[in-house]
Amino acid sequence: MIEAENLSKHYGPKVAVDGISFRVEPGTVTGFLGPNGAGKSTTMRMIMGLDAPTSGRVTVNGKPYAKHAAPLHEVGALLEAKAVHTGRSARNHLRALAATHGMPSKRVDEVIEMTGLSAVANKRVGGFSLGMGQRLGIAAAMLGDPRTLILDEPVNGLDPEGVKWVRTLGRYLAAEGRTVFLSSHLMSEMAITADQLIVIGRGKIITSGPVQSVIDATAGTSVTVRTPRASELAELLVSDGVSISASEPGLLAVRGVESSVIGETAARHGIALHELIPVRASLEEAYMTLTAGEVEYTSTASGATTQDGPLA
C-alpha cells in the first residue's frame, strides 16, 4: 500500500506537487495520469525517497521507503530506465543489485527469463535499445519479489508484444494481492490495465476513482441518432440535463438520455430511426477534458503556443 498525506514539493518558487493526498490499495492496478510537468515523476521520486517532501509525508507498506530494512523486498521501481552503468552487462547489473540484499544468482536468472532478456543478458547495457532498457528496468524492479511495484512509463519504447506483456504482468501481480502503481501516456492501454485512476495536473489531484467512474463522471455516454425528422425529435427530447448537438443534417448526438428512452419517444410519435447507437466515451476523451486547462504547452491549428503566447 502507498499512502500520501498532504504531500508537497517546491523547487524554489516553483510548486511541483501541491498538498496531494491519496492511497494506492493492494490488489489493484492504479494508473497515475497527468500532462508532462504535472508532478507525476516528482511524486514517484518522493515515494522512493529520492526527493524529500517540502511538507507532508508518504509511506509504502506502512513506512517511509528509507525505513525499510530490506527495501527491494518491499518496493520495486522503474523510474529511469537509463540509470544503469552502460559498461555492465544486464546480468552483472542485476547481480550487483541482488548482492545488496543477499539474493542468490538464481533470482537474477529468474527475472532475466521473466522479462525476455535471456538472449542479451551478457551484453553491455550501453548497446540496448529503448525497449530492452525498459525490460531491464522492470527486471530490476521485480528482483526482490516486492509487495509494491512503482512503474513510471513502463511501456515506453516497447513493441506491441512488450506492451501486452507489461499489461499482463501488472494484472497478474495485482491478482496476487500486490500494489501496482504505474503511469503512462497510452490512454487506450491504461483503460484496460488499471482498476483505479489518479489524475494530476499542475501538482494537484484533479480526480480519482475507478476507471469507468472517472470516464462516466467526466465524459459520460452519448447516443448517436440518425433520423429524417431530427429537428422534431430533438424538440421532443429537450429537458433539464439533456444536451443535443447536430454534426450534420439528420444526425444527432444526445447526452443525458438513455437510448431506450429515445427509441420509445420516437416510436410514440411515429418518427423513423435509421440509427440508434449508444456511444461510451473513451478514457482518452475523459482525460483530455479533465486536463484541458492543466497543460504547460498546447498546440493550435495555426501553430504551437505556450502559456506565454506563440512560439517563434
Regions found by a protein language model. Give the residues of each.
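ABC transporter nucleotide-binding domains
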Residues: 2-4, 9-201, 207
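Residues that scaffold the ATP/ADP-binding catalytic core of kinase and kinase-like folds
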Residues: 68, 214, 286, 290
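Short, surface-exposed acidic/glycine-rich loop or hinge patches that mediate macromolecular interfaces
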Residues: 65-66, 102, 205, 228-230, ...
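Conserved NTP-handling cores and scaffolds of large molecular machines
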Residues: 101, 218, 241, 280, ...
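ABC transporter nucleotide-binding domain
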Residues: 166-257
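C-terminal coupling/interaction segments
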Residues: 255-312
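Residues at or immediately flanking beta-strands
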Residues: 57, 222, 272-275
